[in-house]
């Protein structure tokens, strides 16, 4: 055998051929000011080009891809930079895959924009990339507004903490005597302080009769050193808090308009007919909107509040069949173990280290609220806590809630909770069956 034949044979053995699933695929590496675009090598002399990020540049990208006869495009979900290019490509009729950046990592030592774009194009042409979940236009609008409302609520709470800090620096301890500084009594006292009142005795008429603290405790808490700089900070923080509350109300009006566009033309029950509004809940009748959108009441699920159900809707939409199964749904929410198996053995089962989205956080908060409840879910939470700790119990219970939500929304099933005695009996019988099976295995081994 000649040397040339040996070399050609060794080359054939070293190469791995992958079937082309998407022969007309392109890959784009997204950036803030530059986008690198790669097309198949047989589409021209130049298969990788860099474009700017202005609107006219995005149109040039779409035009060039049309000239190269590309019909499907893959791009990384890099920050928010992908959004405008994604919208332009969809308008021009391309099938666009938005891909998790972890799934497109290039070989170490070959990191630059052009090689990344070529690598994405190669993976996409071989059908190795999966598109992220993307909601429709209405859900996208709702998600943007609900996320903005959440940010406003968090900013609002920061100003409350700064108000408390200002009073603490003046040794005004009223925030340790009453439970809520933004309630009726707390707001009245802060407004009086800003208005110039300094005598503790004059604050007593502002105290609501439902406050549990005694008059003596309230009087003691309102004696301090009234420093001008801290009074100025208190006034500014209070005004900013009120401003944030106004902005939250305006944001809720926009959210309600979106919900109205998603529901049939029927009258929504007024605020007076809904259950009592808790703190930080929307000012409109969220439950009725959700009931009409889903045709079932998801707020009946243990621990799921109105704002929690609204956040889940804004993140997942109304069509949960996109996930295929409840297992994929809880995996997307990062509420199941990331099992790593090697040699037939489980070597790791920890959760993926990624920030949970708003829907996952809503399920976790609902699960945490069940730790002292006297229903079957609370019993399950406490059993999981004794097994693996608080965090383990929250994730396990949140997974239960996510599965219940998935079945209710997708299959239009009503929430039918177990009786706690029946649930405990079911668990007892299952444990007996497990122990009997383990005993038989030990007897066989002996």
Where in this protein do the model-derived segments appear?
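A detector of single, family-specific signature residues
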Residues: 1-446
